[in-house]
């Protein structure tokens, strides 16, 4: 993946060498060999934000009401791992943003994040990149917000689901 990004970056520089102003290249793409998935979130800029990329993992992906979903985490297993340009659920905690100029690797139940260290690498982790370019192209959004969470309502009921009758009997 890193070599592919290097090739594309170098070819783009060569193709644009006579241009006065060159817009950064946004390179979000995924490759797989059938057992491992490698995904990039990359931009040829040290100051701009790349197009957004998020991932979520858990035990299952459940529909809480028609058209609304959430990731369920019943244990520490990561049976479901999703990668998307934008969060697919209204639960902010369901999604983790992949940092700009990073590689996300998924192999079985293991998720690894690695920075791409090249001329566009930003050493300061607190540096705020500009999202203007990605937003102007419609390539960056935000996590959707759901309605306010009711206090004192257990999580399953808050999602519109209920516990099996046997579980309720054991709790009482």
Model-derived segments and their meaning:
Residues 1-172:
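Conserved short alpha-helical segments that host acidic/polar catalytic motifs at enzyme active sites
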